[in-house]
Amino acid sequence: KILDGVAFLLLLLFCFSFYQDAWRNRFPICVYMDLYHQLSIQKDFWANIEKENEKYLHTAEKYITQAGDKPQTIVLVIGESMNREDMSLYGYSRKTTPRLEEIDKNERNFLKAKIAYSTRFSTVAAFNTMLEFDPAPLPEHGHVLAFFKKAGFHIVWISNQEDTAIHAEYQTFSDENVSLNRKGGRSSASMDEKVLPELASALEKAHGKTLIIVHLIGLHPHFSLRYPHDLKPNWDENDEVKQMLKNNGQSLRNQLLKSQYDLAMLYQDTILAKTFEITKEHSAGQPVSWVYLSDHGAETGRRDDLMGHSSTTLGGYTIPFLFWTNRPDVKLIAEDLEKRPFRGDWLSYMLLDIAGIQCKFPYAEKSWLNENYLWTEPKEITELKKHEKNQEIY
């Protein structure tokens, strides 16, 4: 009878777990059936990716009115899990981005959006918003890489992040693919410095119209694997940040993760600075633009006892956005542009604008560089701000 009672209680617990969102998150066995179904659908999509890409190319051909004939190179660097609140470039007390600060100080055309958000908190979902058009401007699904391809751009994809979905849905549009990381998941220890010689090589070969996309592993958990182990902090580890974490009741584990995250940020500072410097070195005599953003942010202990991906706090969506160009035809009024907020799901419109690809649908109001830019805060961000409990940023 006792065993029967225990079995009955376990059955109730199992049923209860289906009902509770939090339990579904903590005990994924309860959602395996639905997950299997979703993966089956996605697998079928990937199996037919060539047909899907043909649809995207047909759509692009139908909507492009002017492809732009001027040779130029655009370098798009996409980071991972970078929260601008942990960048000294954006006012963080730890000196985590000294090289970017130096570039910002000395380069007139180097700009940062003071406010920037992703509208998704995970990589694939963020890519889907960054490189695809939302339904509003098009009656059918649009893909910015298809537009670039139809406009005559040579597309190079350099990746240090192994992701089947990203490869299937995005890298297949490229003319050249350089995959530097064959190990997926959080346990990969592939250093982002691998992309630097590949970027230099791609820039040396660039001719005509070229789009180079560099996908970094960035600050993807595990943070301790995102920087060389001999890298040392340039700040006192018992500084005001550490004290704030203690005062806010952060666990010892999260205090350690915070230190690892900031060290990973210091390493990323070097990588990003070098991608910029390499791009600039190869910009003589040709129009070149450099764009950086993170796919999404990460919660770093400011709002919750949490370090990492977060769908429920603003840190999960808070990102940096950086831009540089040597093009004289792009009007750069730093004070005005840097005040403009940026949203990741509007990236594709700005890329079209830089490339000079004109379309049957309007996009000027969503292009950060355009004089007709009109900011609308993402509803996801507005809702999170309403529920923000701790506004203190240290």
Predicted regions span which residues?
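Active-site-proximal alpha/beta segments of enzymes that process anionic O-linked groups
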Residues: 14-76, 81-244, 318, 343-375, ...
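Short loop segments at secondary-structure junctions
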Residues: 325-330, 357
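Short beta-strand segments
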Residues: 117, 157-159, 211-218, 262-268, ...
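Active-site rim elements
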Residues: 132-135, 185-186, 254-269, 276-280, ...
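Membrane-interfacial entry segments at the cytosolic side of transmembrane helices
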Residues: 2-9
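Histidine-centered active-site microenvironments of extracellular/periplasmic hydrolases
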Residues: 91-95, 280, 284-327, 364, ...
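C-terminal, low-complexity/hydrophilic appendages and adjacent surface loops
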Residues: 314, 388-394
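A long, amphipathic alpha-helix that forms part
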Residues: 197-200, 238-290, 342, 346-348
